[in-house]
Amino acid sequence: MAKKKKTVASNGIAHIHATSNNSIITITDINGNAITWSSSGAIGYKGAKKKTPYSAGVAAEKAAKEAMAMGLSTIKIYVNGVGRGKETAIRSLAACGLTITEIHDVTPIPHNGCRPPKKPR
């Protein structure tokens, strides 16, 4: 039996979570319901290759193509984290043909809250 094609509204939100070990891209509708997602690990990269900006770009490209197939055309981008794949993921979303209206950096920054963990030697 053929799979039913899902359609969504033309605008949505892309959440980019860039950690030091992986990059996760989730595309949602305006209400926050997930449309599609992808990550460096889900594509097939393992270990140190997941950290690279290239893998974040490939993951963003995969998520964007799936979302565009469902009818998405414009997005707002919320970036979270300090990983290396943030900028590449944004560029990949734009290169796929999605129109970007806003970019927000929502990385939590403490106003001298908890003591950070000690640095590795």
UniProtKB/Swiss-Prot annotation:
Entry keyword Amino-acid biosynthesis: no
Keywords, in A-Z order: Ribonucleoprotein, Ribosomal protein, RNA-binding, rRNA-binding
Biological processes per GO annotation: translation
Listed InterPro entries: Ribosomal_uS11, Ribosomal_uS11_bac-type, Ribosomal_uS11_CS, Ribosomal_uS11_sf
Gene Ontology cellular-component annotations: ribonucleoprotein complex; ribosome
Keyword DNA-binding belongs to the record: no
Pfam families: Ribosomal_S11
Superkingdom to which the source organism belongs: Bacteria
One Gene Ontology molecular-function label: rRNA binding
Function as written in the Swiss-Prot or TrEMBL entry: Located on the platform of the 30S subunit, it bridges several disparate RNA helices of the 16S rRNA. Forms part of the Shine-Dalgarno cleft in the 70S ribosome.
Family: Belongs to the universal ribosomal protein uS11 family.
Subunit structure: Part of the 30S ribosomal subunit. Interacts with proteins S7 and S18. Binds to IF-3.
Protein name, entry field: Small ribosomal subunit protein uS11
Species annotation: Mycoplasmoides gallisepticum (strain R(low / passage 15 / clone 2)) (Mycoplasma gallisepticum)
Classification lineage: Bacteria, Bacillati, Mycoplasmatota, Mycoplasmoidales, Mycoplasmoidaceae
